[in-house]
Amino acid sequence: MKGLILVGGYGTRLRPLTLTVPKPLVEFGNRPMILHQIEALANAGVTDIVLAVNCRPEVMVETLQKYEKEYGVSITFSVETEPLGTAGPLKLAEKVLKKDNSPFFVLNSDVICEYPFKELADFHKAHGGKGTIVATKVDEPSKYGVIVHDIATPNLIDRFVEKPKEFVGNRINAGLYILNPEVIDLIEMKPTSIETETFPILVEQKSLYSFDLEGFWMDVGQPKDFLSGTVLYLNSVSKKNPEKLTKGDNIVGNVMVDPSAKIAASAKVGPDVVIGPNVTIGEGVRITRSVVLSDSSIQDHSLVKSTIVGWKSTVGKWCRLEGVTVLGDNVVVKDEVYVNGGKVLPHKSISANVPSEAIIM
């Protein structure tokens, strides 16, 4: 089987992290985001994976060659010279996706969930249509494009309603699909949207179905959602692989700590925290709902909440970071500084308070 991951461009929504590391390699749950997807595809029997990118970061090539060996898959880049939307990349990767008659998976690289690829493939085969969209239920459907089903046929999609004013349903497109190779024939080689141009044709042909996703789902493409997604992910791990979480007298709730990290006995970590390799946490530090990336240090008596601390960064003593603050790579926050919703660019040193949302350049 085959899979296409829509990686896209420069990950601008996740800046400042993506100023130094390509978005697919930013660690989510202490593993590069894209590795969650490659592993799930490989476990479902996928052997050919295409990454649809606008640029081909050389740093990604090396990492992905390692994953090819580890998971026994072939990973190729499909590089767009101009952005091709969400359907154009399928046409561009036609050679790989149509190399046999088996269906192929398509997924958005920002989506983190319990990827149901095996069940999705079985469901797709059983209904015999040309495409299946994974659907997730949401509390506020008025913000999204909502899937409306055919009354007579279970799971057959009748239409999509964009940001409905009145309630028509609560299932939305989760950004994961399985499609038959002939669907590529419906796509032209130009900027095209799979959601607004390709799927309506399949709906008209009565050949597009939806599959309900169990468990959590999150588009983690921006810092606020990256943190919310981390909460959901850790909750899922606590149920399915509790041994991956860290326990201890100074650990509260769901916390994942790399074994190489050093945490002072009087620090308190959690709930909903991920701490990366070679991180140092000082005495009396309090961390909640945050991600601390590798080689960083949080010094004594600082409070860190709803924050992403970038690689090789240092938070001084008696600091307070909150309000979806994001420190880029190699940032220094001096002692006794308050940062509330600051986005601090790489290699910056800050010694003044940031009382409200701001970009520190």
From Swiss-Prot:
- What Gene3D superfamilies does the entry give? Hexapeptide repeat proteins, Spore Coat Polysaccharide Biosynthesis Protein SpsA, Chain A
Pathway recorded for this protein: Nucleotide-sugar biosynthesis; GDP-alpha-D-mannose biosynthesis; GDP-alpha-D-mannose from alpha-D-mannose 1-phosphate (GTP route): step 1/1
Enzyme Commission number(s) from the entry: 2.7.7.13
Q: Native species of this protein?
A: Candida glabrata (strain ATCC 2001 / BCRC 20586 / JCM 3761 / NBRC 0622 / NRRL Y-65 / CBS 138) (Yeast)
Report which reactions are catalysed by this protein: alpha-D-mannose 1-phosphate + GTP + H(+) = GDP-alpha-D-mannose + diphosphate
Has UniProt tagged this entry with the keyword Protein biosynthesis?
A: no
- Which SUPFAM superfamilies does the annotation name? Nucleotide-diphospho-sugar transferases
Can you tell me which family this protein belongs to?
Belongs to the transferase hexapeptide repeat family.
Q: What is its main location?
A: cytoplasm
Please name the taxonomic classification of the source: Eukaryota, Fungi, Dikarya, Ascomycota, Saccharomycotina
Keywords, ordered alphabetically:
Cell cycle, Cytoplasm, GTP-binding, Nucleotide-binding, Nucleotidyltransferase, Transferase
Q: Where in the cell is it found?
A: Cytoplasm
Q: Name one GO molecular function term.
A: mannose-1-phosphate guanylyltransferase (GTP) activity
Can the keyword Aminoacyl-tRNA synthetase be found in this entry's annotation?
no
This protein's name: Mannose-1-phosphate guanyltransferase 1
Write down the superkingdom of origin: Eukaryota
Q: If you read the UniProt record, what top EC class would you report for this enzyme, in one word?
A: transferase
The task this protein performs is described as: Involved in cell wall synthesis where it is required for glycosylation. Involved in cell cycle progression through cell-size checkpoint.
Q: Can you list the GO cellular component terms from the UniProt entry?
A: cytoplasm
GO-annotated biological processes: GDP-mannose biosynthetic process
Q: Which PANTHER family match?
A: SUGAR-1-PHOSPHATE GUANYL TRANSFERASE
